[in-house]
Swiss-Prot record:
Example of a GO biological process term: glycolytic process
Entry similarity comment: Belongs to the DeoC/FbaB aldolase family.
Catalytic reaction equation(s): beta-D-fructose 1,6-bisphosphate = D-glyceraldehyde 3-phosphate + dihydroxyacetone phosphate
UniProt subunit comment: Homodecamer (dimer of pentamers).
EC number: 4.1.2.13
Protein name: Fructose-bisphosphate aldolase class 1
Organism: Thermoproteus tenax (strain ATCC 35583 / DSM 2078 / JCM 9277 / NBRC 100435 / Kra 1)
Amino acid sequence: MANLTEKFLRIFARRGKSIILAYDHGIEHGPADFMDNPDSADPEYILRLARDAGFDGVVFQRGIAEKYYDGSVPLILKLNGKTTLYNGEPVSVANCSVEEAVSLGASAVGYTIYPGSGFEWKMFEELARIKRDAVKFDLPLVVWSYPRGGKVVNETAPEIVAYAARIALELGADAMKIKYTGDPKTFSWAVKVAGKVPVLMSGGPKTKTEEDFLKQVEGVLEAGALGIAVGRNVWQRRDALKFARALAELVYGGKKLAEPLNV
């Protein structure tokens, strides 16, 4: 069996860094997320955007993959999800199996956990089963590690983000998606405690300005992260492709914000 972190890097970080275009928001937040840029409601638009910007992959839920995935960009199939209609303790359970992900052409699978929730045990237990299946089918497992509920007051506090990273490592992630602390120095500690597991920053809600998000990305790279898994901060923008290409210059080209970018 190949090292699945190495396999993830070969597929999703061919140039040494990674940009993944996340698009699991339809179930997580609903169609309201598509209103800023109505084109983004069309999964074919998302595939073109990822392909034309030269991104390393996309994240889809199973229904989108079944109807739209064309193999033009590597796929991370998200195995679980929740809605904003639910108002209880944070929990997200599987709606797709690793075996089904393989049949849909996925190159990796993703799963969200909410450490701190009253249901963390349920998600940890399910993640263990998914990890066994991912090893069986030779698919890297990307863990979205978002402490939430319980004692968690500030989800981006440095100690919480670092804990999230360590939990993902301990539970067998081959790559992880965690939130940014807002500062490269504190985020570098999260990257360190993630050990050998590559770190992707969660893009989060669209920032007020494009430069605000580019500054976040620059800080994340300075901290030693592999890259970003971003959705709304790209496809909610009216000129999404232009901004996506600016991100590519920053992440892949090693440009700094002090230099001219394609924005």
